[in-house]
């Protein structure tokens, strides 16, 4: 069940949903607006001929910190990692979905490629996968609204929430845009 503004406020008051820093003015009818942090991860395209998710490629990306009062310029066709300004923490009976803002989508900004789901028990900055599909550069200002967080109540609390040892949660407590850690649990299944 998708939570309404009243339910979101109740979960925040109960401590089962937390955003830090939190601004009550960002609560919408069925979501909470989240803002863009000042850290970005850019791809070092000149260092690799390809990306291999089964291997550790530590220098595939580099962190860029945008100076105060300046934007990050995302050029047409570019893809970068960024993160929410807010640290988001979900209880074991809540899951989240991060969606883009309609106003930004109409300018050609995609907020996430595929990873918009947030598991129950997660706590940390949410990594954003930003793409510019427009024909002009897009100025990204730290602190601007970048997405909206929708919260869903599970039918029962998760038996093993994100962060428990069972799943080897690789991104729990992440600070800033975190590069892929797919290689840490790489596995392929037989094909026919």
Swiss-Prot record:
Catalytic activity field: dCTP + 2 H2O = dUMP + NH4(+) + diphosphate
Q: Where is this site: Important for bifunctional activity?
A: 116-117
A GO BP annotation: nucleobase-containing small molecule interconversion
Q: Does the keyword Transport apply?
A: no
MF GO annotations:
dCTP deaminase (dUMP-forming) activity; dCTP deaminase activity; nucleotide binding
Which residues are dCTP-binding?
A: 101-106, 119, 127-129, 148, 162, 174
- Judging by the UniProt lineage, the source's domain of life is Bacteria
UniProt cross-references to InterPro entries, sorted A to Z: dCTP_deaminase, dUTPase-like_sf, dUTPase_trimeric
Keywords, sorted A to Z? Hydrolase, Nucleotide metabolism, Nucleotide-binding
Q: How does it assemble?
A: Homotrimer.
Under HAMAP family, the record lists: dCTP_deaminase
Know the name of this protein? dCTP deaminase, dUMP-forming
Please tell me the species this chain comes from: Salinispora arenicola (strain CNS-205)
